[in-house]
Amino acid sequence: LGDVYKRQIQEREKREAEQKKAQENEEKFRELKGKFFGLSFTDGLIVVSVLESVDDYYKEGNALHHCVGQCEYYLKPKSLVFSARINDKRIETVELSLENFKVLQSRGLCNQNTEYHDRIIQLVQKNARQIRKRMTA
């Protein structure tokens, strides 16, 4: 029990240190992604919105148990990350290439695809023009 407890504390401390570093990177994140803030689209059921803060990345990763909140994903200059939701419940996280405007990945809980997976990808692809416009704004 002692080793498990120590490991849990170490993991928590590591996450807290990563989160502190991420907060320090918030300004750089805003410079990279600020032009996309407020970008959101829907098909009537699914709402896909840009993650607008480093904290949003952590919350998204923690809620869906995948890596978007780690490895400084928020500082990747050539991708944009969205949260796909239904009734404000997170369904999948979507990463879009800002080079070719194709979905690189879309992952639900524990990196699984959901029943809405294809629909989410189609929604993002259908709205690529809106995203592209923000790049030149």
Regions of interest found by a model, annotated:
Residues 3-137:
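Catalytic-core elements of nucleic-acid end-processing and repair enzymes
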